[in-house]
């Protein structure tokens, strides 16, 4: 089993700072996410804000994990409707009423990474789109609520699976959360479905993302030929939310926190959004 970094209190506070700025980036872009705007225009606004306001770098721009040989060409991932993840911003992709949109941002500052994503609904939502977006938000929190010392990473996958299964929704198997800190993608890989192999137990100081990708149809995926974009094989809608989580002595805390982030579901017991007023 690969070693998972245990972060010091000082490192956790550094991660909290960069995490809050990554969340602030999503707050900044929120009023611009509307019908008639291209995903490239949104990406350019966020890159400018990252560099000139946050004084940070985009971790996505030029990112090359080495498995496809194609550096990622934009600063953010913007995935619309049936795009599961890694949607490349484009001037040709114009948002329209009823679209569901995931915006995923990762910034690097002072040697640490902050990574989060948020769903947006353009104009009047469709019944199916609104249901999926809300269900995915709950799915993520169901997984997060399992985090506390003594439990294990597989408990996240079990909780996420059990949350959406009664709704007839499916969770993508091929992608998951990840450790994060001084590296963008570290150990562990966080599965959002149950797995049969043993997983590590949570220990205070572990930091990772929880980011289930939930499809309205079947779980199966298809890669487009641009080397990055992943879509649902049956063309059904897909949604994703992402937060950074740190294990504490008694439970967990959220590191990607901002004034504009949605309130957690009312049934969440382990965390309360801070008062920014």
What are these regions, as identified by a protein language model?
Residues 1-277:
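Active-site neighborhoods and metal-handling regions in enzymes and metal-associated proteins
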């Amino acid at each position: 089993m690969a070693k998972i970094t245990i972060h010091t209190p000082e490192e956790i506070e550094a991660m909290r700072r960069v995490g809050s700025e990554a969340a602030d980036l999503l707050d900044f872009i929120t009023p611009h996410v509307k019908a008639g705007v291209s995903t490239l225009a949104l990406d350019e606004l966020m890159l400018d804000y990252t560099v000139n306001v946050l004084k940070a770098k985009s971790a996505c721009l030029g990112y090359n994990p080495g498995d496809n040989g194609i550096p990622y060409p934009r600063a953010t991932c913007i995935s619309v409707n049936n795009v599961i993840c890694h949607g490349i911003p484009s001037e040709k992709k114009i948002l329209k009423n009823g679209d569901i949109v995931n915006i995923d941002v990762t910034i690097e500052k002072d040697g640490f990474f902050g990574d989060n994503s948020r769903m947006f609904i353009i104009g009047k939502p469709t019944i199916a789109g609104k249901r999926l977006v809300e269900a995915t938000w709950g799915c993520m929190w169901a997984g997060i609520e399992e985090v506390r010392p003594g439990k294990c990473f597989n408990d996240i996958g079990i909780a996420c699976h059990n949350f959406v299964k009664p709704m007839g929704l499916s969770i993508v198997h091929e992608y998951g959360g990840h450790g994060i800190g001084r590296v963008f993608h570290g150990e562990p890989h966080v599965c959002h479905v149950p797995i049969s192999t043993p997983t590590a137990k949570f220990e205070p100081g572990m930091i990772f993302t929880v980011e289930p990708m939930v499809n309205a149809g079947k779980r199966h995926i298809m890669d487009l030929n641009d080397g990055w974009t992943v879509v649902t094989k049956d063309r059904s809608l897909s949604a994703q939310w992402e937060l950074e989580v740190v294990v504490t002595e008694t439970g967990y805390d959220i590191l990607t926190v901002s004034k504009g982030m949605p309130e957690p579901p009312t049934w969440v017991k382990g965390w309360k959004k801070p008062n920014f007023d």
